């Protein structure tokens, strides 16, 4: 006997006393996933090392500058009365960047000892810097900087009653010894610095007088004469400190820059920093606070008010500032006057000098002695000392000497290499007299037959645009080495060090020469002398 059960659109039959198990099958239904779908990242242009397309030769050259000297006032530039912007004495401080722009000769126009080194039809020559030595003259010394009206309120290092209300000028004449810095950055483009500057508020908010300005981190090229970080921070003091007395004279209206090592290390082509040498040290010598109205009021839940009897009813100035100090200076910690060899750069550019130039950024505060000069206002010099009859002057002097070892390299101009160099820097190919054809155009161009006829408009020849120097408006100390290359490495101190380091020997040019030893084959075939034979006489 069977039982019928209606289910949905069908009929299911069950048999009595029979073991039957119905199975219900449901068709699968596809639904889109609710989870986020991540696409693969887009492909990026691959940056290759210069070692992949630059072939190095066995030809090396030495190039060096003459003695480089500079003299000036360590705190400010001296402008004579009525001279306008003309400066009589420039500002020369040990706490300035010295950025040397080294100009090299064009190797493709260079007189080479062997003309078969490269094929000018398919190859180009470039320089690679493999060695460098920065010589520094003058003795080690410490130079002070300060301000005759320095904003120093209380000595917060020792116990002192807090000065709550300041109603008069309490500035003092203070001098400090700055942070100690030794720095050297080598690259084929200028180094990049960073500093904090005054930013802008989002509209419609407006900055009211007395409000704290917003800060913005800016990146700029480090130029010759820019101030380094002296221990007061990398910032624009001219726009962020209106009192002009929070820091010493030489930086109160200047911008102190700090090298942006993060950005230069992340440079995809590695042109701004082949390598760098850095040594910094400082400690806090004195602890002071600043005079003025506190812009940020101390929350009342952070302290318990005192009484007026002990002058602690209201808190005093809580803007604290130390005086930096660079501590002891020794010759054991010197980074200069020693050679450095470049085997592998930190970036993709392994020392190739694009555009035949180098940028050397140097800081050395271990030779910051300021010379004191005094001149009598009377002639002859008074026999009795009177300070009003003598004028005091301060000068700072610096002495440099740059030495380099360059290696001659070749680049085979294949289509792939030229396309890569064009994407990296198209001006390199332009300097090699390679041009990129303009894109095709569909517009008609008018061409007159009689160009000199007065019946038609004047056909002026368009002058080709002049090549613009991208660093024309920037300040650098230019060092021209175009006529100072020499292949006689043994005639220069750095060249002799390079020969020893590279394991190379030079041929003797004078003196007797040893005879060449006989070859093995000649010695084996040569006749040997006969042995002596003794003949005894018969008795």
Swiss-Prot record:
GO terms for molecular function: structural molecule activity. InterPro entries: Capsid_L1_Papillomavir, Capsid_L1_sf_Papillomavir, dsDNA_vir_gr_I_capsid. Residues 517-528 have a biased composition (Low complexity). The keyword Disulfide bond applies. Pfam families: Late_protein_L1 (PF00500). Residues 505-539 are annotated as: Disordered. GO terms for cellular component: host cell nucleus; T=7 icosahedral viral capsid. This is Major capsid protein L1. The keyword Lyase does not apply. It is found in: Virion; Host nucleus. Forms an icosahedral capsid with a T=7 symmetry and a 50 nm diameter. The capsid is composed of 72 pentamers linked to each other by disulfide bonds and associated with L2 proteins. Binds to heparan sulfate proteoglycans on cell surface of basal layer keratinocytes to provide initial virion attachment. This binding mediates a conformational change in the virus capsid that facilitates efficient infection. The virion enters the host cell via endocytosis. During virus trafficking, L1 protein dissociates from the viral DNA and the genomic DNA is released to the host nucleus. GO terms for biological process: endocytosis involved in viral entry into host cell; virion attachment to host cell. It comes from Human papillomavirus 45. Gene3D superfamilies: Major capsid L1 (late) superfamily, Papillomavirus. Self-assembles into homopentamers. The capsid has an icosahedral symmetry and consists of 72 capsomers, with each capsomer being a pentamer of L1. Interacts with the minor capsid protein L2; this interaction is necessary for viral genome encapsidation. Interacts with protein E2; this interaction enhances E2-dependent replication and transcription activation. Keywords: Capsid protein, Disulfide bond, Host nucleus, Host-virus interaction, Late protein, T=7 icosahedral capsid protein, Viral attachment to host cell, Viral penetration into host cytoplasm, Virion, Virus endocytosis by host, Virus entry into host cell. Residues 505-516, 529-539 have a biased composition (Basic residues). Belongs to the papillomaviridae L1 protein family.
């Amino acid at each position: 006997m069977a039982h019928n059960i209606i289910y949905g659109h069908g009929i299911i039959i069950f048999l009595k006393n029979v073991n039957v198990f119905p199975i219900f099958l449901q068709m699968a239904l596809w639904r889109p996933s609710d989870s986020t779908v991540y696409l693969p990242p887009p492909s990026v242009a691959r940056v290759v090392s210069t070692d992949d397309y630059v072939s190095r030769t066995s030809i090396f050259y030495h190039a060096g500058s003459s003695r480089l000297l500079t003299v000036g006032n360590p705190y400010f530039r001296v402008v004579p009365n009525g001279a306008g912007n003309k400066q009589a004495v420039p500002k020369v401080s040990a706490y300035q960047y010295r950025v040397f722009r080294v100009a090299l000769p064009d190797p493709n126009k260079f007189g080479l000892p062997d003309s078969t080194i490269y094929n000018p039809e398919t190859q180009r020559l470039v320089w690679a810097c493999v060695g460098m030595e920065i010589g520094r003259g003058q003795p080690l010394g410490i130079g002070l900087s300060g301000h005759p009206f320095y904003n120093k309120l209380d000595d917060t290092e020792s116990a002192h009653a807090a000065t709550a209300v300041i109603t008069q000028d309490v500035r003092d004449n203070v001098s400090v010894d700055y942070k100690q810095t030794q720095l050297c950055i080598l690259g084929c483009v200028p180094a990049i610095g960073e500093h904090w500057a005054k930013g802008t508020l989002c509209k419609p908010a407006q900055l009211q007088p007395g409000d704290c300005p917003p800060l913005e981190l800016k990146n700029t090229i480090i130029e010759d004469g820019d101030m380094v970080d002296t221990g007061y921070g990398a910032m624009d003091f001219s726009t962020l400190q209106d009192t002009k007395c929070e820091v010493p004279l030489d930086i109160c209206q200047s911008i102190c820059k700090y090298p942006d090592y993060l950005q230069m290390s992340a440079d995809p082509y590695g042109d701004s920093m082949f390598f760098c040498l850095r040594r910094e040290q400082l400690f806090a010598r004195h602890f002071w606070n600043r005079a003025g109205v506190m812009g940020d009021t101390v929350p009342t839940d952070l302290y318990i008010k005192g009484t007026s009897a002990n002058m602690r009813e209201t808190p005093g100035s809580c803007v604290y500032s130390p005086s930096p100090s660079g501590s002891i200076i020794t010759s054991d910690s010197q980074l200069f006057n020693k050679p450095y060899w470049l085997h592998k750069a930190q970036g993709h550019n392994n020392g190739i000098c694009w555009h035949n130039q180098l940028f050397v950024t140097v800081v050395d505060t271990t030779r910051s002695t300021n010379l004191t000069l005094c001149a009598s206002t009377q002639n002859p010099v008074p026999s009795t000392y009177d300070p009003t009859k003598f004028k005091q002057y301060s000068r700072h002097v610096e002495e440099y000497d740059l030495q380099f070892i360059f290696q001659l390299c070749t680049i085979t101009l294949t289509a792939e290499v030229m396309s890569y160099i064009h994407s990296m820097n198209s001006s390199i190919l332009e300097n090699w007299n390679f041009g990129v054809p303009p894109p095709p155009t569909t517009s008609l161009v008018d061409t007159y037959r009689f160009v000199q006829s007065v019946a038609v408009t004047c056909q002026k020849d368009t002058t080709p645009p002049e090549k613009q120097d991208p660093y024309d408006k920037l300040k650098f100390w230019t060092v021209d080495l175009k006529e100072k290359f020499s292949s006689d490495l043994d005639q220069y101190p750095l060249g002799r060090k390079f020969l020893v380091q590279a394991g190379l020997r030079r041929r003797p040019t004078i003196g007797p020469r040893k005879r060449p030893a006989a070859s093995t084959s000649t010695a084996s075939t040569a006749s040997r002398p006969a042995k002596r034979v003794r003949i005894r006489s018969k008795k």
